[in-house]
Amino acid sequence: MGPIPRSITRTLSRFRTELTSESSPLVIHELKVAKYKVSASLQYLAFLVFLPWGISISFQEGLGPWVTNWWNTGQSKIFFSYLQEENALERFGEIEELFLLERMVEDSSETHSQDLRIEIHRKTIQLVKMYNKDCIQIISHLLTNMICFAISSAYFIMSKKKLTVLNSWIQELFYSLSDTMKAFSIISVTDLCIGFHSTHGWELMIDSISENYGFVHNEQIISGLVPTFPVISDTIFKYWIFRHFNRISPPLVVIYHSMNE
């Protein structure tokens, strides 16, 4: 068996048969079903990829002015202050260092001391504005993510038929491969997404999610999750492969372990 899935060659064979006027009504029906599976699956995948992205952009622009006005009224500053408390303390620590520097040089020049006070005051206002902007962005991201999750979940529930078609199409593509190509595909996906070679990708993803939800970058938490989560996921996935494919195709399990080693 070559690297081209049998489902694709079958579809091309049906199409060629139809062009040569050798087709029967059953073959035409099968060809239409195959075309529907491909188009419905690709449309569903496109919606899953671009729907959250489009919702995020549209609601970020729409919620921005409302969140800014709501935050500036001072109704929830205390409630959300803990989200960026560590970051704010670190920034204002710089101001404290500048005050200490001022005390050291205030005897040398009164003019210089006055300029330093002005600079410290300006820097303080700048940091307060930056902190205020960060808090507004955190709230906007939280609201946008909740709305995006709700809409995506509703679409996912309402489109169970397309999900069934997508699942059928993927299974047809996968099971039409040879055992060697199946094992190669599984190893490629696992190493790329959840394997031991994807630790840097997990680090970037965890850092991006934490910043998106307003949590301060914590190197200890990231360094603890990155080496642990891929190992657990890889172990669970290998166990599932052994339980599932050992009943369907035992040679695939043997080839998978041989290639993985």
From Swiss-Prot:
Bilayer topology annotation: Multi-pass membrane protein
Compartments in which it is found: Plastid, Chloroplast inner membrane
Reaction(s) catalysed (UniProt annotation): K(+)(in) + H(+)(out) = K(+)(out) + H(+)(in)
Ion transport found in the keyword field: yes
InterPro entries: CemA
A cellular-component GO term for this protein: chloroplast inner membrane
Biological-process GO terms, alphabetical: potassium ion transport
UniProt KW keywords: Antiport, Chloroplast, Hydrogen ion transport, Ion transport, Membrane, Plastid, Plastid inner membrane, Potassium, Potassium transport, Transmembrane, Transmembrane helix, Transport
Transmembrane segments annotated in the record for this chain: 47-67, 138-158
Function: Contributes to K(+)/H(+) antiport activity by supporting proton efflux to control proton extrusion and homeostasis in chloroplasts in a light-dependent manner to modulate photosynthesis. Prevents excessive induction of non-photochemical quenching (NPQ) under continuous-light conditions. Indirectly promotes efficient inorganic carbon uptake into chloroplasts.
Family designation: Belongs to the CemA family.
Name by which UniProt lists this protein: Potassium/proton antiporter CemA
Native source organism of the sequence: Ginkgo biloba (Ginkgo)
Organism phylogeny: Eukaryota, Viridiplantae, Streptophyta, Embryophyta, Tracheophyta
Gene: cemA
